[in-house]
């Protein structure tokens, strides 16, 4: 899909680098070492995949590994602007492991099963990205990637955060449409959000789950420039109140039958339950959520 999407991109002006570390085991027929690729075009205009760097087996969710891959990309392929896509499994905004009696595998994106299972926490991502130029966008092509907590933690690293507050369909982003949107000169965050959502909208029947992916997808785009104001207004509302979250819509149904999940609750509904006047909060939220 990425190579198909690259057909609509001027490869003489833009670089698309893809780091792949799949889940196949070393020794299996499908196994490949972690590899950084560049998608470009040959002299005939055909999209080709060239190897930038093949690594030895490594834990790709190790912050040092992510740091090295990004440093290589920035050094060897400098550009006027940058975007980042993080794709794998994802579990929201609370760190793994959670240092409480109720353990929860959350606040991470990325899963590496080399020698066990390890995850990359959002706080680690923020620390790594702070060393590099600010991104135009960060797209989480992973479940539960779009929460206000995640976006707030990354607000100094990127202009826009794009992702889903729910689980996403198995195929993930439709890169045939998303890749061209990534190289839009203006309003890139919203363009990516539309390019992710609209292909699923065309398939939507309301039936879920379905291997034809007719259950739809939830996607939003957050403008990080508006998050400090949203945080300020939110603090003014929640500082004086407590509420049973059992009354609030929970996007993660797993938390209802497993103590290993804490749930992801609808923020707008929460604020409406905490205050009879959410005019200021709604205005701040509408400014932050641009799609």
What do the predicted segments below correspond to?
Residues 99-291:
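Terminal, contiguous helix-loop blocks that mediate binding/assembly
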């Amino acid at each position: 899909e990425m190579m198909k999407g690259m057909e609509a991109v001027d490869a003489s002006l833009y670089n698309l680098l893809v780091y792949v570390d799949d889940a196949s085991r070393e020794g299996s027929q499908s196994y490949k070492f972690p590899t950084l690729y560049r998608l470009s075009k040959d002299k005939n205009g055909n999209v080709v995949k060239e190897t930038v760097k093949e690594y030895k087996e490594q834990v790709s969710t190790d912050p040092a590994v992510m740091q090295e891959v990004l440093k290589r990309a920035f050094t060897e392929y400098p550009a006027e602007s940058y975007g980042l896509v993080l794709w794998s499994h994802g579990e929201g905004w609370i760190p793994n492991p959670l240092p409480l009696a109720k353990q929860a595998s959350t606040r991470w994106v990325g899963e590496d099963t080399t020698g066990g299972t390890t995850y990359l926490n959002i706080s680690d991502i923020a620390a790594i990205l702070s060393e590099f130029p600010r991104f135009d966008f960060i797209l989480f092509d992973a479940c539960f990637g779009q929460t206000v907590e995640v976006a707030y933690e990354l607000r100094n690293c990127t202009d826009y955060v794009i992702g889903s507050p729910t689980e996403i369909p198995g195929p993930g982003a439709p890169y045939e449409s998303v890749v061209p949107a990534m190289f839009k000169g203006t309003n890139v965050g919203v363009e990516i959000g539309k390019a992710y959502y609209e292909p699923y909208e065309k398939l939507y029947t309301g039936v879920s789950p379905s291997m034809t992916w007719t259950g739809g997808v939830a996607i939003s785009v957050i403008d990080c420039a508006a998050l400090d104001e949203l945080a300020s207004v939110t603090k003014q509302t929640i500082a004086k109140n407590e509420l049973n979250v059992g009354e609030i819509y929970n996007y993660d149904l797993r938390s209802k039958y497993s103590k290993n999940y804490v749930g992801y609750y609808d923020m707008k509904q929460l604020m409406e339950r905490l205050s009879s006047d959410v005019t200021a909060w709604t205005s701040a939220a509408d400014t932050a959520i641009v799609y």
